[in-house]
Amino acid sequence: MNITDVRIRRVDNKNPGSKLLAYVTVTFDDCLVLHNIRVIRGQKGVFIVMPNRRTKVGEYKDIVHPINQNFREILQSAIFKEYVKENPSSLELELG
């Protein structure tokens, strides 16, 4: 499965403590689209969060997620590459 498009929607938060940097949409093989991946700046660096939902007991469960580390790294790398391309001066990536 190839990543054929990555679209970044940067979030300009008024709250200086907000960790959310952007929402991302990724297209695979020009036939499948995955919306609402989030780019977050955490204490250990920048990372992606897959789309999720909150359960009745308050836990968050991913709706979709990579099943191996190799694909997660490919996905994260494609997202970060596009983010830096669109926002060259706004982010020094400290990978988490």
Swiss-Prot record:
> Do the record's keywords include Transcription?
no
**Alphabetic keyword roster:** Cell cycle, Cell division, Septation
tRNA-binding listed as a keyword? no
Question: What Gene3D superfamilies does the record point to?
Answer: Stage V sporulation protein G
Q: Which InterPro entries does the entry mention?
A: SpoVG (IPR007170), SpoVG_sf (IPR036751)
Pfam families, from UniProt? SpoVG (PF04026)
GO BP annotations of the record are: division septum assembly; sporulation resulting in formation of a cellular spore
Give the family, as the similarity comment puts it.
Belongs to the SpoVG family.
What this chain does, per the entry, is described as: Could be involved in septation.
Q: What is this protein called?
A: Putative septation protein SpoVG
Q: Which gene encodes it?
A: spoVG
